[in-house]
Amino acid sequence: MTQLPYAVDAETPLNPAELNVLRAQYEKEGEMVGVQTKFNYAWGLVKSNVRADQHLGVMLLSEIFRTSPERRRECLYYLALGNYKLGNYAQARKYNDALLENEPANLQAANLRALIDDKVTKEGLMGVAIISGVAVAAGVIGGVLLRNLGRKR
């Protein structure tokens, strides 16, 4: 991966002790969890390298985004980052573009856009290669079958 100035944030998880502090606070508050505590825990989860953590982080951020309009701006980048890390590039781009629409000079979001675009391009090329390979294989198999049918007659 090309290291962009803010890309380190996308790839640097909290250490387990730091994440455990956030988890403990979240669990301690229980049903009455505060928005800031929930956001902090979601932030730590999104930064994780564990897919289940990332998924939970995106879910918590989505809840904050829906229920706390005053916190939406804060959620946009981490929703974009979480979806990027989960491979949901269309969702990642949607959240990131919403942030860039309001903050066109946001370097973090601009760098995340570059990461998203790079992944989409690479996966698009991979998809084309896979489809091409399947088409070639189908053509070879079809040719062999037709040749064998011709010999039987």
Swiss-Prot record:
Localisation per UniProt entry: Mitochondrion outer membrane
GO cellular component: mitochondrial outer membrane; peroxisomal membrane
Top-level taxonomic group: Eukaryota
Topology in the lipid bilayer: Single-pass membrane protein
GO molecular function terms attached to this record: lipid binding; molecular adaptor activity
Organism: Neurospora crassa (strain ATCC 24698 / 74-OR23-1A / CBS 708.71 / DSM 1257 / FGSC 987)
UniProtKB keywords: Membrane, Mitochondrion, Mitochondrion outer membrane, Repeat, TPR repeat, Transmembrane, Transmembrane helix
Assigned protein family: Belongs to the FIS1 family.
Record SUPFAM superfamilies: TPR-like
InterPro entries: Fis1, Fis1_cytosol, Fis1_TPR_C, Fis1_TPR_N, TPR-like_helical_dom_sf
Pfam short name (any one): Fis1_TPR_C
Ranges per topology, Cytoplasmic: 1-124
Main localization, broad class: mitochondrion
Chain positions of TPR repeats: 73-106
Entry comment, domain topic: The C-terminus is required for mitochondrial localization, while the N-terminus is necessary for mitochondrial fission.
GO terms under biological process: mitochondrial fission; peroxisome fission
Full protein name: Mitochondrial fission 1 protein
Regions of this protein lying in the Mitochondrial intermembrane compartment: 146-153
Transmembrane parts of this sequence: 125-145
Function: Has a role in mitochondrial fission. Has a role in outer membrane fission but not matrix separation.
